[in-house]
Amino acid sequence: MKLKRMLAAVVAVLLVLVMMFTGCGISKRPAENADKDNSQSGKPEIVNIGSQQMPDDEKVAIAKGFFEGELGTKVNVIEFQAGDIRNAMIANNIDFALLGSSSAALGIANGMDVELIWIHEILGDAERLVAKNGSNINSIKDLKGKKVATPFATTTHYSLLKALELNGISERDITLLDMQMPDVYAAWQRGDIDAAYAWEPTLSNLLKNGKTIISSKDMAAKGVVTLNVEIVRREFAKKYPDIVTKYIKALNKAVVLYNQNQIEAVRTVAKALNITEEEALKQMKGSIWLTAEQQLEPAYFGTSSKKGNLAGSLKDTADFLYKQKSIVSKPKLSTFEQAVNPSYIENALK
């Protein structure tokens, strides 16, 4: 009988441990009870975070457990490819989402009911147009008649189209293919494409047999700035504003770690993405991470009383997408001013 009681106790402990750890993992789908209140705390039982495989502050925050620590509730991280994450947000399958500024501008212009609450990074050398060795592509003008791949409605797509425009080349002059990053690399290996505008980790693989034609850093110098940003469902934010503020605190904590202990941040990203620390450092240095204080500067969010340039930048992106017929009607600046909300960053700094 004693043995049976001991075995029962061990099983009970194991069950408790399983229940503890299944609430904080990376999933492929949203938790069904995502927007239910925890009757004891008034918090959602589970927060669904839409993420992507990127070497950024969110990856650090996830790997370090900053979200669980700040939010005080279960966190379910769902990994997406670039185009799918916006659709998941539209379907209310996730509460938070990381996506490019072009995708955010497209979604907001088309009525996606979200608030933009954080800039993950200003994109630079982390996104580049790469031409395959032997393709005879040495400049943007050499893309005429070539097959070029990138995921549509993303920052790379936007940068590519702007690069073509600045060089007097029509989209019709090239064969432009809509591919997610894993498909880009597969097509590259098969010899199906001549060039691709890509981000990490696919970018590093392309550069093994290719060369950079232009980077998003080069495009930024020409006035074409692209970002990765965080959005939240407006309904969720209205119901749980304190959770959104704490979410910002977790992200800022990751940025501070990167600034104060780069080695630890790099090690964390390398392990999370299953790449070497050298690769992680190179990828992370390809973009600029902003602290919460920096995000409130006029060049970005600005403040609640005086909005900064971010809304205007999104409007410019949307205007270009409208010209490309990706958006049915031209959006007003006020549409983006209403979506850009610096108050959560302001509250996180109090």
List the model feature ranges, each with a label.
Residues K239-S326:
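Secondary-structure end/capping motifs
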Residues S102, L177, D183-L273, E278:
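Pocket-lining segment of extracytoplasmic ligand-binding domains
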Residues K59, G65, G69, N87, ...:
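Solvent-exposed, polar/charged alpha-helical surfaces in well-ordered, non-transmembrane soluble domains
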Residues S51, V60, A82, A97, ...:
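Solvent-exposed, acidic/flexible segments
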Residues M1-I46, I345-K350:
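Short, low-complexity disordered leader/linker segments with a strong preference
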Residues G312-K350:
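Conserved C-terminal helix/tail region of periplasmic/extracytoplasmic solute-binding proteins
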Residues R29-S170, T175-D178, D194-Y197, S216:
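Short, glycine-/small- and polar/acidic-enriched structural segments
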Residues G145, K208, N341:
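Phosphate-coordinating loops and pocket residues in cytosolic domains that bind phosphorylated ligands
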